[in-house]
Amino acid sequence: IGAMSAHGAVATGIATLTSDHTVLDVWYPEPELGAASSSGHAVLSGDEVPAELASLTGPDEDRGVERVAVRVEISDLTEPPADAYDAYLRLHLISHRLIRPHFANMDGLFGKLTNVVWTNFGPCAVPGFESVRARLRARGPVTVYGVDKFPRMVDYVVPSGVRIADADRVRLGAHLAEGTTVMHEGFVNFNAGTLGASMVEGRISAGVVVGADSDVGGGASIMGTLSGGGKETISIGERCLLGANSGVGISLGDDCVVEAGLYVTAGTKVDVRAGAWAEREPVKAGQLSGMDNLLFRRNSVSGAVEAVPWKREGVELNADLHAND
């Protein structure tokens, strides 16, 4: 991504604020990378508000919120997010594919966001929501999509060339490369995603990136770093396959396979049947992290986890399933 050499970002959008100025969400239709002299946000008024956004501003008394136009600048994306306006812009930059996961500093981002009731009428504050629900019911049925700090990506960004079978399964801040298909059981967290055409039928946890032409099989799991004290960032290389209900707590290089039902954590003891490792004692899987051309399998007789050489042609995706025009 050529524009990723830029270290700043700017955007104009619509923020939803409660009466105490808590930020429930911010939508930036056209964020940009570019130099910014300073970081911060400014509320726009009058002629400062772009014509296409003017009709979106104003109070929503039923929800108890005010919608305002804002201009937000970030001078240095390598610095942690300063506030919710900043945090939402970083999430938009990733989902708009202007930056890749890990390009921007996301330290402390979770704490900058507030818990929100996401409804078909827009974001609402959690405190007092039942009164809000009662007022909204006069407009029609009230659907609550979730109570969370992160909204669904597709309510803010719909990237070109992707298929998402269930919108609830992709958070704002996910990076879906052109040609990516996320099926009903797939899930992609924020600051994570795919770097090329991929099939996602399992879970891509926060911080995880998956290389081009890889397949995350049904129910497969890739360990993230949000909970459990984990610091290791997991990546999956190109042309890899995670079999159904498999999982990894190590990175895979290119052209690797984990057989269905096998979970390989960093501490899993592995009998290596490849190259210079072949005659050694079992090693911890963490020592194999990032290596290319390995098939991880469980010996059905001995029960031992083995790593054996895997063909260099790797995994081939069905092109028809990824022509997402």
Q: Predicted segment positions?
A:
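Glycine-rich hexapeptide-repeat left-handed beta-helix
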Residues: 205, 209-212, 216-325
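Short, surface-exposed recognition loops or helix-turn segments adjacent to catalytic cores
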Residues: 106-110, 183, 197-199
